[in-house]
């Protein structure tokens, strides 16, 4: 467990439970977010305790106790690079320090610093401008990095189709004009068509697991030049993904660098909110609103039109799913679609495993600011109830 967690502990003293729980919550959310593990034996779970006797966790004391490990770190310089947010505060400094300490403890290399003048930013822009069928491949790492808002700005300025990973379907609204589907084994046909026909892929926030690239991974993105950004350097070296330009960096930093560079180039984006028909109008191509000018599709369509065509023609939801009598069971795809359409913007939906997770990820109509939270790693039964409590 130690090698895959930020902190792990078996609780043997019932009176330490408050301290350990508070420590885990603080550590998992501070610095680079990551898992913490508490092993609580059943006899400890059944012990009676007095709340007044429990000692809490003090983050400042924890930092003081770890000063020996941090005494060689140039705190201001390193932490600013690791916590690239709009405003830099003391809490951000602590986050950056903990990132460094954790990586040194586990022998992990530091992600590189990226800004608008970095060569990789120019390379990405050059390849998108030259591409005929580019795709922006996104994952939940964008949200973990706190970059979901800047991602939408960058996507609008780039103007290329966006596909979403299994655990990131809520990173972009369903009706967003650039959304092109969900690739992977549990994704949909439009998303897989887009990836397999792409000639350039920019992947940010996704580790491109087997669930995303498939077991026949040698044919994944068969014609695409790929730029892959990951905060874990080892993810960029695995044999199941071909990476032409690996970017070992924080997702926020790369997106911020792209945003700044596109601003410098005078590219402001279309500003067309969730209107696919309006975006596809020919007068928008080449007007400087976005970096990409439409590209090449099939049968007289450009690339944006081609992806929009696939989204409509090969949607996992079909109209006949609604064709049933009142005394017949509802189709699960129809149920999920209607449920999602009845929800308001910025509402949170948490699902368990099985059809709720798989069908939900395929047909859920994500609205502006809404969340769709599912358990995507180890398929634990019963995840939905505690997750829903946490989401509230």
Task: Report the location of each language-model feature.
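Glycine-rich, anion-gripping cofactor-binding loops and their flanking helix/strand elements
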Residues: 140-227, 357, 363, 367-391
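Active-site diphosphate/adenylate-binding microenvironment
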Residues: 308-391
């Amino acid at each position: 467990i130690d090698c895959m967690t930020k902190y792990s502990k078996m609780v043997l003293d019932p009176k330490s439970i408050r301290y350990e729980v508070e420590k885990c919550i603080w550590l998992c959310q501070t610095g680079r977010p990551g898992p913490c593990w508490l092993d609580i034996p059943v006899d400890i779970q059944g012990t009676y305790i007095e709340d007044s006797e429990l000692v809490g966790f003090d983050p400042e004391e924890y930092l003081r106790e770890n000063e020996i490990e941090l005494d060689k770190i140039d705190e201001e310089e390193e932490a600013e690079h690791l916590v690239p947010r709009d405003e830099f505060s003391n809490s951000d400094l602590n986050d950056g320090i903990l990132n460094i300490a954790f990586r040194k403890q586990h022998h992990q290399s530091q992600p590189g610093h990226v800004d608008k003048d970095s060569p990789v930013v120019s390379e990405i822009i050059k390849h998108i401008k030259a591409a005929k069928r580019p795709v922006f491949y996104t994952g939940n790492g964008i949200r973990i990095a706190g970059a979901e808002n800047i991602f939408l700005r960058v996507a609008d300025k780039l103007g290329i189709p966006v596909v979403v990973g299994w655990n990131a379907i809520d990173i972009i609204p369903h009706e967003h004009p650039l959304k092109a589907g969900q690739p992977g084994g549990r994704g949909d046909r439009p998303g897989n068509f887009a990836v397999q026909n792409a000639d350039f892929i920019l992947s940010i926030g996704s580790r491109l697991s087997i669930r995303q690239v498939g077991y026949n991974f040698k044919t994944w993105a068969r014609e695409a030049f790929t730029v892959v950004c990951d905060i874990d350097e080892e993810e960029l070296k695995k044999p199941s993904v071909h990476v032409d330009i690996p970017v070992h960096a924080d997702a926020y930093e790369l997106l911020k660098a792209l945003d700044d560079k596109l601003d410098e180039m005078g590219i402001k984006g279309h500003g067309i909110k969730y209107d696919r028909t309006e975006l596809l109008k020919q007068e928008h191509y080449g007007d400087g609103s976005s970096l990409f000018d439409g590209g090449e599709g099939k049968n007289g369509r450009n690339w944006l039109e081609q992806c929009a065509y696939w989204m409509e023609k090969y949607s996992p939801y079909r109209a006949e799913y609604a064709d049933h009598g009142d005394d017949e069971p509802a189709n699960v795809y129809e149920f999920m679609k209607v449920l999602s359409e009845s929800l308001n913007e910025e509402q949170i939906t948490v699902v368990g495993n099985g059809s709720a997770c798989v069908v939900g990820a395929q047909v859920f109509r994500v609205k502006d600011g809404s969340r769709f939270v599912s358990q995507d790693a180890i398929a634990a039964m019963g995840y939905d109830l505690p997750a829903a409590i946490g989401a509230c």
